[in-house]
């Protein structure tokens, strides 16, 4: 019975690898990290009012950032946003 459990575990892990590996190679990942330019704008959980720029899929647009939290799709300037996210 011990060998049957080992074979079952190997089979399970093999199937898990085959199912999840393509997601790691998808277009949303670069160098093992999620492409921040595809994330939605996120004002964060705080109540401050800072002007920031985010990439909306076509260009960089302004949004109001609350000062904490949020995600990586926030840039201090339009130039910084375009440099990181615009495709040549």
UniProtKB/Swiss-Prot annotation:
Intrachain S-S bonds: 37-85, 46-68, 60-81
Subcellular location as annotated: Secreted
Pfam families according to UniProt: Kunitz_BPTI (PF00014)
CDD domains the UniProt entry points to: Kunitz_huwentoxin
PROSITE patterns the record matches: BPTI_KUNITZ_1, BPTI_KUNITZ_2
Cellular component annotations (GO), alphabetically ordered: extracellular space
SUPFAM superfamilies: BPTI-like
Main location: secreted
Keywords: Disulfide bond, Protease inhibitor, Secreted, Serine protease inhibitor, Signal
Site residues by UniProt (Reactive bond for trypsin): 47-48
Propiece residues: 28-33
UniProt site (May bind Kv1.1/KCNA1): 39
Family listed: Belongs to the venom Kunitz-type family. 02 (native) subfamily.
Protein role: Serine protease inhibitor that inhibits trypsin (Ki=5.54 uM) at a molar ratio of 1:1.
Protein name per UniProt: Kunitz-type kappaPI-theraphotoxin-Hs1a
Species whose genome carries this gene: Cyriopagopus schmidti (Chinese bird spider)
């Amino acid at each position: 019975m011990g060998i049957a459990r080992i074979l079952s575990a190997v089979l399970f892990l093999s199937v898990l690898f085959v199912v999840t590996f393509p997601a790691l190679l998808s277009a949303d990942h670069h160098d093992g990290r999620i492409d921040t330019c595809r994330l939605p704008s996120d004002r964060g959980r705080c109540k401050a009012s800072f002007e920031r720029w985010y990439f909306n899929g076509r260009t960089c647009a302004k949004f109001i950032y609350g000062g904490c939290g949020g995600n990586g799709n926030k840039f201090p300037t339009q130039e910084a946003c375009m440099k990181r996210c615009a495709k040549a």
